[in-house]
Amino acid sequence: MASNMDREMILADFQACTGIENIDEAITLLEQNNWDLVAAINGVIPQENGILQSEYGGETIPGPAFNPASHPASAPTSSSSSAFRPVMPSRQIVERQPRMLDFRVEYRDRNVDVVLEDTCTVGEIKQILENELQIPVSKMLLKGWKTGDVEDSTVLKSLHLPKNNSLYVLTPDLPPPSSSSHAGALQESLNQNFMLIITHREVQREYNLNFSGSSTIQEVKRNVYDLTSIPVRHQLWEGWPTSATDDSMCLAESGLSYPCHRLTVGRRSSPAQTREQSEEQITDVHMVSDSDGDDFEDATEFGVDDGEVFGMASSALRKSPMMPENAENEGDALLQFTAEFSSRYGDCHPVFFIGSLEAAFQEAFYVKARDRKLLAIYLHHDESVLTNVFCSQMLCAESIVSYLSQNFITWAWDLTKDSNRARFLTMCNRHFGSVVAQTIRTQKTDQFPLFLIIMGKRSSNEVLNVIQGNTTVDELMMRLMAAMEIFTAQQQEDIKDEDEREARENVKREQDEAYRLSLEADRAKREAHEREMAEQFRLEQIRKEQEEEREAIRLSLEQALPPEPKEENAEPVSKLRIRTPSGEFLERRFLASNKLQIVFDFVASKGFPWDEYKLLSTFPRRDVTQLDPNKSLLEVKLFPQETLFLEAKE
């Protein structure tokens, strides 16, 4: 039985030779032939490429034999009925459909997206960029090709490019924007961001890293250590400018190209180790010739070259881990997982939640019922032969990505390393119980990847479904939709319960508010009554004080009055009769020589102060209080007797 690594190599060779792009179909055909590469190719090529195969004893059609350069003409023959025989095409060979390639081209602070068929040339890309950037083709250097510099006449198909590509434009003949002084230029560079395109030589992987101009070369090397696990002292660099002689130098003054600069990093190693690693990546595929010595035609006749035949196998050997071993911080581990997943399978993939599993629970379950979602946990395993198929064909399908984004929170973990596997099983046992943990623990490698669908409940988290990697897009979508139906039914109940609970809480809040308003109204009435009583008390006190003051004044005036003269007196006597507003009369005798003020004091001593009342005489009618109080009664003609009236002043 072929190992997992051998299977990936066989699968890559089988797809390259047959041109079958559907990985599910390729695996099915290989499994039918017990992973025998030659038998599988013999069984597929007649149907897929329109080539007839001779039967036992059948008459062979005259024609030239297939003579690959790798087999001499004197090679021993075989009588196998499955051997390749000279054939003539019975129908037209199916032509390869042109691929659509996506290019993102960066120039200074602009990004231009270009989509072309792989039958186009590099020059056609430049023509499009000339219209977009207004830069003549003759002044333009298009960089970023993995194979180095290419000619404008190079056909894209011959470069064997992936679907998504990143390029950048350099214009060395065009003057860059000038600054007023060197200090100003340096300050401007310190504020700029440099894109460093760093190629990891051993694994043939590119990292696009952004650094500010104030970052140092040492900081770049430390960041590269975090990504490649190559210590700074073991890093072997290519591409630094000659002026970058000190690791403490900032990028702005190191002479890097702006906006992007290409660098290459590798591990310092002996030539013998390098040769040994190269030899381990070489894979030979031997075909069996028939009894007549006919050989299998070269793979280039099928439209693929050696790089396409062995590229997938070499790529598999150079894979970077999805997660660092013994990952301490789940957020950092998932950042690396997302970056590596994108580099392998493209940018069209589910949005993986960056954070701990507990944080994913909070995001999915511990919100309002209307905002809750299902939690999908993707468990990756690099050693499973199904991983590449599941990720590229199913998990990255646009329909799956869209459905997951709308209805799920997607969290991922890599179980390839034993330490990471043990850590996830611990989390699984804590959150889902020992039964689910044991189920995952007993899964075989070839049953991965797994897709767990989790629904949050009031007291626990329920695993609705465990989807294994040997599925199809339609089946995966059906199982996701089935889980969504269960979740929707539960969500409707939760929404109803939540609405009822919120209604009860609203009623309680309204009652509490009404009670509070009632208490405030009672308190306001009580405070108003208290203020009224206090005001009445204050006014009463003022009134009493005024009465006491008036009484004191009255008594003092009464005591200050001269004694009333007798009727028979040697001096002239004036008798005054004063009518009060109530109709009563006040009578008293005064000496004719007494001043008018004494009359006023007498009236005031009876409770009628002269500043509040006025004295009026009848004949003639006059206001006595307007007369001079220092004149005598005789002078004001209130002698020998007079009747006066008291009247309140207005």
From Swiss-Prot:
Phosphoserine: residues carrying this PTM: S320, S582
Localization: Nucleus
Keywords noted in UniProt: Apoptosis, Nucleus, Phosphoprotein
Stretch list, region Disordered: 62-87
One of the GO BP terms on file: positive regulation of protein catabolic process
A single Gene Ontology CC term: endoplasmic reticulum
Protein name: FAS-associated factor 1
Organism name: Homo sapiens (Human)
